[in-house]
From Swiss-Prot:
Enzyme class: hydrolase
GO molecular function, one term: nuclease activity
Compartment annotation: Cytoplasm
E.C. number: 3.1.-.-
Listed Pfam families: RuvX (PF03652)
Biological source species: Ehrlichia chaffeensis (strain ATCC CRL-10679 / Arkansas)
Protein name: Putative pre-16S rRNA nuclease
Keywords for this protein: Cytoplasm, Hydrolase, Nuclease, Ribosome biogenesis
Cellular component GO terms held in the UniProt record: cytosol
Taxonomy, superkingdom: Bacteria
Known role: Could be a nuclease involved in processing of the 5'-end of pre-16S rRNA.
Record InterPro entries: RNaseH-like_sf, YqgF, YqgF/RNaseH-like_dom, YqgF/RNaseH-like_dom_sf
Record family assignment: Belongs to the YqgF nuclease family.
Keyword NAD: no
Amino acid sequence: MLYKNVDEFIKVIDKTKRIMGLDFGEKKIGIALSDRTNLIAIPYSVYVRRSSRKDLGSLYSIFVENDVGSIVIGWPLELSGVENELCQKVVMFANRIITRYKINICLHDERYSTAMATRLAKLANIKRKESQAIDDKISAVLILQQVLDIIKVYQM
C-alpha cells in the first residue's frame, strides 16, 4: 500500500525487517538501507536506470537479498509544498513496485535532501565530480534517516 503519511506507514511496517530508502530520479536512483535494528540509515548504492522492468527487477533483488520489508521513497515536492511532474512519476513508480511485489511504501518529503547531501560532501572535502557520483545515495540516507528518527520517537 502507498502512504503519504509517516504516522500511518509506521503502523504497518514489519519491525523485524529492514527498510529501504530511495532517492528517485529519472536517470538514477539513490539507495540506502536501514541497519537490522532500523535505527541507522546506511548508504547502499546508486542504481543507473535502464528500463522500468529492469529497474523493478534490480530493486527486487536488493530487497530480497537484504531482507527489506518496506520502502521509503523521497517525495520531490516544490519548495512551496506543491506537487510537480516528478511527484507523479514517483507515484507511478511506487505503484508499480506495490502491484508487483506487495510491499508497503511511504512517500516522504525530500525537500532540501540533495542540497544537504551536496553540502555534506563539501564539508567532507569530497571533490565535486566525486560528490556527484554519491549525492543520490547520500540523499537516500537522509530521506530514510528522517523516517527512522520518526519511528524512534513513536517507540519511546
